[in-house]
Every structure is written in structure tokens, then in C-alpha cells.
Amino acid sequence: MAKKSLIAKNKRPAKFSTQAYTRCERCGRPHSVYRKFKLCRVCFRQLAHRGQIPGVTKASW
């Protein structure tokens, strides 16, 4: 989990557009965040396995 101060800092508008970065909506992780779902890969995988993300199925080929 991210520190509360970092989550609050991320909610404020960035001074410059290049300073803005995405965080996971669920846990606050700053790396490997899928923009479409606003979730990090770890949270995405957990929710997908539980079937809580509509339209997401496990790939098999």
C-alpha cells in the first residue's frame, strides 16, 4: 500500500504535465498501471481471477 501522503500528493494537479503519473485506484501502486482499468497488474490479476472485471477472460491458445 502507498503512503497516504503520496496518494494525496497524486490527487493534486501537477505543476507540469510531465510530472503527472498514474497510480492504482485500489492499492496506490505507481508502476505497471493499466490506464483502461486504472489498476496495477497485481490488482488486475486478482480481480480478473475472481470474475469481478466484466469482459475479461483468461487467454488460452
Swiss-Prot record:
Gene3D superfamilies: 30s Ribosomal Protein S14, Chain N (4.10.830.10). It comes from the Bacteria. Zn(2+) binds at C24, C27, C40, C43. Keywords: Metal-binding, Ribonucleoprotein, Ribosomal protein, RNA-binding, rRNA-binding, Zinc. The keyword Isomerase does not apply. SUPFAM superfamilies: Glucocorticoid receptor-like (DNA-binding domain). InterPro entries: Ribosomal_uS14 (IPR001209), Ribosomal_uS14_bact (IPR023053), Ribosomal_uS14_CS (IPR018271), Ribosomal_uS14_sf (IPR043140). Signal peptide: none annotated. GO terms for biological process: translation. Binds 16S rRNA, required for the assembly of 30S particles and may also be responsible for determining the conformation of the 16S rRNA at the A site. Belongs to the universal ribosomal protein uS14 family. Zinc-binding uS14 subfamily. Part of the 30S ribosomal subunit. Contacts proteins S3 and S10. NCBIfam families: PRK08061.1 (NF005974). This is Small ribosomal subunit protein uS14. The gene is rpsZ.
